[in-house]
Amino acid sequence: MEYTPVYPEGIEREAYEAALEKCVISGGWLLNQSMLDVWFDIDGFVVKVPAGTRVRPDGWTLVRNLVSGMETEEFYGCTAPVNRCGFKFLSGHKLYIYNDLVVFSPDSARAQGGYIGPPGRTLEEHIALINTMKLQKATIIAGDLSFLPRCPSLRTVGIQFAQGLDRELDFSPLYQLPHLESLSIAAPNMGLTKGPAIRIDFTKLPGLRSVSVCTNDPYNYDQVPTLEQLWHSNDKRHRDLTDLSCSPVLKKLELLCCATKSLEGIGRFPLQWVSLSYLRGLEDISALSGCAETLRILNIDHCGRVKDFSCLQELVNLEYLILDGSQTLPDLRFLKKMPKLKFFTFSMTVEDGDLTPCLDIPYARCDKGKKHYNLKDKDLPKEHAGSGFHLI
């Protein structure tokens, strides 16, 4: 197979190429060891390889999260999803054989990239299956969402814009789903070119717990008091986190390629997982100390303007820590103040060259060795980092 990188329109090329350098092919797997989603043209199919995962370009595959160690069977658009009686599903797990139904609306809708293929059943048959089986999760290849009120059992909805869609979607049918808890909206045109604006009123989605959105369209998820997980990329409006959310239960925050300059306000949330990737304007992370009691996983990936990492020594409950970038850390002595840490990887330079603090961690990885280091990566512990990370 031929793997050709695809460059999304508007992406910061330096950051993207740095991410591509962390993609390797091993044992038939394509591993993305960066914290940035990348795209490849694989024998004519455009494939998204999510950050921190590995995929095998043969359709259904086991995807391993390189950060948490968790393994789940998912589909990332390599060839064809699992087909059962003409219906397509994005989970091949034998215990969840009806998980994540792919719904084409209208029947003529086609997935971007062409990897899912045409529907084997009509929209009406998809609606009937959802209601008969009381399905809770669906991914919609969307040109029209007007059918959603007829599927009240849905709790998790992923929306992918149909190929060639050049108009705004009407998201108001989502407001009539009584049990919606998780909503993911993929970037139009796979994020490769600018697409239609996304306009949605999150205040009309009571009970929403998880939101995943892309692009710089104005979102009011900050007014959702039940939000527990938030992933946002390309947000150019917020310079700090003071008005990020009104939710008192926000546990997981992932920001990618946003205009954030300071983490001021982050201490208001009981965050357990924070991922900061390619935030080129981010300069101050000192507010992380306000999350010391709850924070268990922290990823700082290519946020080049951050120079002061002294707040790390206050994060005594961390279990997973990833520090990637071109900055210099004075030393790694802060690791000794993290008794629960079981996973640490870094590519930043350690000024004093002493890597011995890594020896007390079950799993440690040095991605860029230096001549003045007193240990090489092969000398660092490589024990299993546990059963993976789960939000409490």
Task: Name these PLM-found stretches.
Residues L30, M35-A128, K134-F147, S153-P173, ...:
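Concave beta-strand-loop units of leucine-rich repeat
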Residues Y3-E9, N32-S34:
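Intrinsically disordered, low-structural-confidence terminal and linker regions
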